[in-house]
Amino acid sequence: MPPIELSQTQFEQHFGYASQQTVFAPGRVNIIGEHTDYNDGFVMPCAINYGMSVSFAKRDDSIWRVYAIDINETDAFDIKKEIPQSEDKWKNYVRGVVKYIQERCPEFIQGADIAMTSDVPMSSGLSSSAALEISIGKTCQVLGNLPISLAEIALIGQRAENKFVGANCGNMDQLTSALGQKDHLVMIDCRSLDISPTPVPQGYFIAIINSNVKHDLVTGEYNSRRQECEFAAQFFGVKALRDVSPEQFIERAAELQQLNELAYKRAKHVISENHRVLEAVEALKANDMQKLGVLMGESHDSMRDDFEITIPEIDYLVELAQVAIGKNGGARMTGGGFGGCIICLVPNEKVEALRKLIAENYQKQTGIQETFYVCTASDGVRVV
């Protein structure tokens, strides 16, 4: 059953009456621009046709009752009182967003019954957490008729994940889930929050292949990567690595390498990756899919060798995909790293060959069964 239908039927089953409204927030996949968002850089993701559905109804008090359908767990808290952190991680995503919505809009004290479900695979690098944050943020906005923009909801979602959940993520995932556009990739400037939509190339599909090796950003090495980037930014005397051009990096690279080898490698990735995103925009405008494929390949190599966030299973998937796709199109790891998914921009006529090559080889080599999704670029959060 699709998530929208599921959240509505399960709401009624669980609470004993029908929900009033439903919000759907999509997951996202990033075509290029990895670990650049928290360096104030550029990214090029799209919202996907998988996401989080939240069905809800107003209560006549200030209690929130939350039913997480997929794990069959519940939460309850009073939003007129201080909202405490929970030992259950999923509850903190919901509580954190509500808490920071209230900081922005202190008048928000509307209680609600909520049932939520997602078809974004957890810990896959497709932003199941951002879809949850944005769907809850939009739910608050609708419940209280609050005067907040989608971009603000995105930044509140990021803040909840940073401060309340404890994952030091950037803002790309939340911005994409909030502001995605159907049939478009969105180039986001993570400093100014400017968004430039670019149509998905005609005759191409977005294929996502999940390695089914799970990652966890809170306990993973994500936070240490962020610290290494901040060290490099301080070395260059700038606010963020976005402010260092490739030429400036080359000029002082040897000095940084001597001082801190890891910071050197991380900076090399971020600075070159920012440049690749800008080149990718130009390649798409020119419909130069060969160039885009080269950029995606360079991005993957940089994540593997300099940012050191790929794993053998992911590298193997990318190798297989590159063989199947050929020169027109590309493949790379997508998401935070240490598992998760690869993304492929693949000509329509090669989708089945790609699926077949991976089905014949990946499990044989790794002992793990992959999951293959063909996605469409979708609109951001919406009331359905």
Swiss-Prot record:
Residues the record marks as active site: 173 (proton acceptor)
Q: Which organism is it from?
A: Glaesserella parasuis serovar 5 (strain SH0165) (Haemophilus parasuis)
Where in or outside the cell?
A: Cytoplasm
Q: Where does substrate bind?
A: 34-37, 222
Q: Which residues bind ATP?
A: 123-129
Gene Ontology MF term list:
ATP binding; galactokinase activity; magnesium ion binding
Q: Under what name is this protein listed?
A: Galactokinase
Gene3D superfamilies associated with the record: 3.30.230.10, GHMP kinase, C-terminal domain (3.30.70.890)
